[in-house]
Amino acid sequence: METDISQTEYSVILLGLDNAGKTTLLSQIKALYQPRPEGAPTPNPGKTVPTVGQNVATIPLHDMNLKIWDVGGQISMRGLWQSYYTSCHAIIFVVDSADVGQDPDITRLISRRASSTAGTRNTRGNSSAEAFSEENVGIGAASSEFGRLDECRQVLESVLQNADVAGVPILVLANKQDREDCVEVVRIKEGLVRKVFEGETGSGVRDSRVLPVSALLGSGVQAAVEWVQSRVKWNKEGRPPVMR
């Protein structure tokens, strides 16, 4: 008997620091894919407020439904992310590519952080949950020469270290590419993301990709959804979909 694809549902979680543009991204995805009643006003994805808790939307595609969870990125909310890991089929991690501080050479960030944390990694025996909380203590708004990319790196590493996301496809979106002060996606990929994924604390080989987007303007959003769509199908043996 053939499976009714309209009943196939995959869960995706949107993660990233506060003000990265996750809620705007979800609004843009909804505007692209969710049918609107006749006469309904055109959505304005630019009018959003910071997420406290979660937003959720079911996105109908031709061969599946994507249930997308937008989880708050404030420090106080990040400890709750782990409760979504076991049931998710993909992770979208949103990076604010315009928040790089005064020094755009983000490749220096990795070497500086590596030298300062090399000793502590071997002395900690904490669980991933404890490590996640400890690494985020004292990390706040942008104030360093690197803006919040250092904070972003630590948070992304914490996500990757959790055993519950092993094998889960991860899409990193370099958001706010419409801004003149943004960092190009290739620099985020080479200077930050690749070092995290392939570094000592990363998980080595992983199904992942880095794409540029402007959640505000909608550019790159469809490509992001299509990548997630293809990868959750490819990984359906490892993480089967939910049948609704």
Q: What annotation goes with each model-predicted range?
A:
Residues 1-234, 244:
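TRAFAC-class small GTPase G-domain
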